Amino acid sequence: MAAALQRIEQLSSRVVRVLGCNPGPMTLQGTNTYLVGTGSRRILIDTGEPSVPEYISCLKQALAEFDTAIQEILVTHWHRDHSGGIVDICKNISNDATYCIKKLRRNPQKEEIIGSGEQQYVYIEDGDLIKTEGATLRVLYTPGHTDDHMALLLEEENAIFSGDCILGEGTTIFEDLSDYMNSLKDLLKVKANIIYPGHGPVIHNAEAKILEYISHRNNREEQIITVFRDNLEESFSVSELRKMIYKNVPENLHKMAEHNLLLHLRKLEKDGKIFSIASPAKKWRASL
């Protein structure tokens, strides 16, 4: 069972978590959004989903409670549970200037429209520094979950805002497994102490959690390889493999499990360990 999280919680002298009020199987307790800094204007990391008035109320309450305003908005990646609240924030939380909303570009590049186009993204790059009173954030390009995903290193705390690259509970989904594994290895090199994840509770041993994620994916890959090694003459569909490998996963997570399996299969095919055939549905078998 997911740990209970307060809707507004001060996590450190410079980090306040405001829960997105959008709980679900994919979002856990909801999206974690963060106010970062110590001054009268702070950085907001992520924005939750569109049309969640409870979140806007919580964010207003947090701004009032800590006597602060939003300096700018950083979006860790394009998914709607992280970028979807931008329009509602701009519409319902007054600011003395137009909100500056920053993120990494999609890769390959594509046009991104916020709402009906009143706001536009300001694109930032890997290694950029974003500063506010009491906090310095360094942009870390961490593709894999999405092609535009970024984590942010809070230098004053040696802490990482991990977006959906690493979650406080369970594991995440990804678009490209090779990119994702490289991003995990890059985050490991940072040697951070703490992770503030995009969903779930704070992670207080960053290195152990990242190593756990890397080990989990390597173990999953080994499970898949073992199935093919033990059945050299047979071919398997994604759903057949899911029944063998994700035996205890509840039905509402079957789609996510199959998505992750498919990405493992693509990586193994790229590595030359298996090949795919159409029969008539796509299946895979071991490369002899």
Curated annotation (Swiss-Prot):
GO molecular function: RNA endonuclease activity; single-stranded RNA binding; zinc ion binding
Domain of life, source organism: Eukaryota
One GO term describing the cellular component: mitochondrial matrix
Amino acids binding Zn(2+) 2: 81-82, 118, 164, 199
Location of the protein in the cell: Mitochondrion matrix
Listed Pfam families: BLACT_WH, Lactamase_B
Modified-residue entries (Phosphoserine), positions: 235
Entry binding sites for Zn(2+) 1: 77, 79, 118, 145, 164
Database matches in InterPro entries: LACTB2-like_MBL-fold, LACTB2_WH, Metallo-B-lactamas, RibonucZ/Hydroxyglut_hydro, Sec-metab_biosynth-thioest, WH-like_DNA-bd_sf
Entry keyword set: Acetylation, Endonuclease, Hydrolase, Metal-binding, Mitochondrion, Nuclease, Phosphoprotein, RNA-binding, Zinc
Cofactor(s) named in the record: Zn(2+)
Annotated cofactor note: Binds 2 Zn(2+) ions per subunit.
N6-succinyllysine modifications at: 273
EC number: 3.1.27.-
Stated family: Belongs to the metallo-beta-lactamase superfamily. Glyoxalase II family.
Function comment: Endoribonuclease; cleaves preferentially 3' to purine-pyrimidine dinucleotide motifs in single-stranded RNA. The cleavage product contains a free 3' -OH group. Has no activity with double-stranded RNA or DNA. Required for normal mitochondrial function and cell viability.
Name of the protein this chain belongs to: Endoribonuclease LACTB2
Lineage: Eukaryota, Metazoa, Chordata, Craniata, Vertebrata
